[in-house]
Amino acid sequence: MSDPPFAVKGIDHIVLRVRALPRALVFYRDVLGCSVERQQPELGLTQLRAGRSLIDLVTLDGPLGRSPATPGPGGPNLDHFCLGLAPFREADLSAWLAAYGVEVIAPATRYGAEGEGRSFYIEDPDGNRIELKGARGDGPTQGREL
């Protein structure tokens, strides 16, 4: 079998359906530091820049949010997505998130696209789980978990 005629460069974008766009914008823009790149209110679409990727926020009452695609049995099919952060200073990040009322869940060392590094999970206002991850060497390494 030969190699495919392409190479995956990374995640281009993810699309999240949100109940309240203003609340989602506060979270992704103000808490996580993403910038608004493009808005198409007629579609219920706001696109946020997250490093080299985009996070598309789609309102449930807009044309895109009402699309016929539905989750499989038992609920949504997305477990979580991961945002790589630099620098990853765990205490500073935890304090920043706590100031916004965001709970840090299950801090540990995990493997990702750039190798092992410290990470933890948070949830956005719509319950989407997000992993925030540092590169190897950022933060403590105890509690190794893959």
Features from the language model and the residues they span:
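Residue-level marker for the onset of beta-strands and adjacent loop->beta junctions
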Residues: 12, 43-44, 79, 118
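Vicinal oxygen chelate
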Residues: 18-22, 76-77, 81-126
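A short acidic/small-residue loop/turn micro-motif
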Residues: 63, 112, 136-139
